[in-house]
Regions:
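Conserved ABC ATPase signature
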Residues: 136-140, 144
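Conserved catalytic motifs of ABC-family nucleotide-binding domains
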Residues: 157
């Protein structure tokens, strides 16, 4: 039996409530291949961050399992790097030392020069250098802090990179710049990424597939949308691809209308459970081609 790089099987998370257990999400099953960039989108409260915490080993599911490279995830590991929206930097250390701290933990046998050179290389990859690496987080802008956080995550060369709305607190210009840098780094390193976002345009720019969650409680992963657009992707050109707006319109329609229509009930029947365990695979760009619109190309394997 062929195994996928990341396998999520029938995840559920429940929390104690005044009237019994509250089921945030249930029967979440999906896979991610090595080198794939997958985004997950859904309204606040549907359990996206909780799923990410389970993948990171920071939380345990109420039901279900997560396997990475055939091994069940049961706790935190340097094989999984996490970037949070709030940066999570050590305030008493410089940008460089925030990265070297992680690198030393990953490779304790490296000498000081190896650690420093490796860390500085990743800071340069995200546009930090020429003295900025010596500043403490309080001396950096929000965008620069997030660059440090991203550099730290990439520097430990994790098998899986987890991004929890990493650009949500940034202004539009800074967010766009760092998104472009992330695209370049992921294309160069073939990094496997799972990312939470509320921004449909960001998801289309970055992802190979987009998972769509219904509203909570009893949230489900309803669809897996293929982003059938060519790489490398440039934000100045991607919006002109005939496949772009079919994908975007599909995502917006789900968030505005269908996410609520499909939400709010337990999977009491076999039909409901089958739907929850097997997200519908959707390819809006291909469907647009079949309807007579000509996309400029199919997504290339990374």
């Amino acid at each position: 039996m062929t195994r996928h790089f990341l396998e999520i099987e029938n995840l559920a998370r429940r929390f104690p409530g005044q009237d019994g257990e509250l089921t945030v999400f249930e029967n979440a099953s999906f896979t991610i291949e090595k080198g794939e960039f997958v985004c997950i989108i859904g309204h606040s409260g549907c359990g996206k961050s909780t799923i990410m915490n389970v993948l990171a080993g920071l939380d345990a599911p109420s039901e279900g399992h997560v396997f990475m490279d055939g091994v069940e995830v049961s706790g935190p590991s340097l094989e999984r790097g996490v970037v949070f929206q709030n940066y999570s930097l050590l305030p008493w250390l410089s940008a460089l030392h925030n990265v070297t701290f992680a690198v030393r933990s990953r490779w304790p046998g490296w000498d000081r020069d190896e650690v420093r050179e490796h860390s500085y290389r990743y800071l340069k990859m995200v546009g930090l250098g020429d003295g900025a690496e010596l500043r403490k987080p309080s001396q950096l802008s929000g965008g620069m802090r997030q660059r440090v956080s991203i550099a730290r995550a990439f520097a430990i060369q994790p098998k899986l990179l987890l991004l929890d709305e990493p650009f949500g607190a940034l202004d539009a210009l800074t967010r766009g710049t760092i998104q472009d840098e992330l695209v370049k780094i992921c294309d160069a390193t073939r990094q496997t990424v799972f990312m939470i976002t509320h921004d449909v345009d960001e998801a289309i720019l970055l992802a190979d597939r987009i998972l769509l969650m219904t509203n909570g409680p009893f949230a489900r992963i309803a669809e897996s949308v293929k982003v059938d657009l060519p790489r490398p992707r440039l934000r100045s050109k991607i919006i002109h691809d005939p496949g772009y707006y079919p994908i975007r319109n599909h995502l917006v329609d789900f968030l505005v209308r269908r996410s609520e229509e499909l939400s709010g009930k337990a999977t009491d029947t076999e039909e409901d459970t089958a739907f929850a365990e097997h997200p519908v695979e959707v390819n809006p760009a291909r469907d647009a081609l079949q309807d007579g619109q000509q996309p400029s190309g199919a997504a290339e394997a990374r």
